Amino acid sequence: EVDVADSTKIGVFFGAGTTENKAGSFKVESNDIHVGLYGLTNVEDIASIHYGFIYTHQSADANRTLTVKDLAGYNKWSGDADVTQIFAEAAFKGFNTAAYSVEPYFGLAWIHAESDGYSESVGGMTFTTNPEDQDLQVSSLGIRAGVPFSFGAAKVTLKGDLAWNHFFGDTEAEARMNLAGSGTALIKGGELSDMATVGLGVEAQLSKTATFGLSYTGAYDGDVTMHGLRANLRFAF
């Protein structure tokens, strides 16, 4: 991360992690690599503007039991997926004090996702699924807060975030399945609806160049509930 002007800094980052999803007999695990470029511009003490680009590559292993009438077959496959995201966010800083920060914000993001197809077999029949590429846009209106305090020699900040997110664009994931050579069917996933997100976390400044954070993220709408825990160790140089 470097300062390119009095009020602007830019940086690059790299990350790695794992993702696991389960739904009925379906399970997928992936190893994820993230790289990105970001920037921050402060407008006096009134507002801040974040912007950037993130690319994620996932190498996934999946399995499930496919059932067709009275037949069932256990299948495993591997594949790759790529996700590209461009984002921008503006936050108002006029409520901040030395004792706490409270920042309303509005953000926009564009997300492009593509993944490999896969084949499954049951009772001598083969079914091939090819997911369609997906372009999704997200708008977010929220508020975040932070309270700094000291814990021994470490400077610690307790953070919270609450937002409402609206999805538009390709809000239904689609794939085409070849039905054992007898035709092709269009498969649609559940449509993404407006979603509330909640974040709670704590971040400690371990040294001038190192920070450690632990956080929880939850997402909720009428049909979907998601929970996530994240530990983050960051070194600046």
Feature locations, PLM:
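Extracellular/periplasm-exposed beta-strand and loop segments of Gram-negative cell-envelope proteins
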Residues: 19-29, 57-85, 111-139, 167-179, ...
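Beta-strand segments within the central parallel beta-sheet cores of soluble alpha/beta enzyme folds
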Residues: 52-53, 103-106, 157-161
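Membrane-insertion modules used to breach or fuse lipid bilayers
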Residues: 6, 45, 49, 55-59, ...
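Outer membrane beta-barrel transmembrane domains
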Residues: 10, 41, 121, 125-237
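Outer membrane beta-barrel translocator domains of Type V secretion systems
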Residues: 1-97, 213, 217, 221-223, ...
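Solvent-exposed flexible segments
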Residues: 90, 94, 102, 107-115
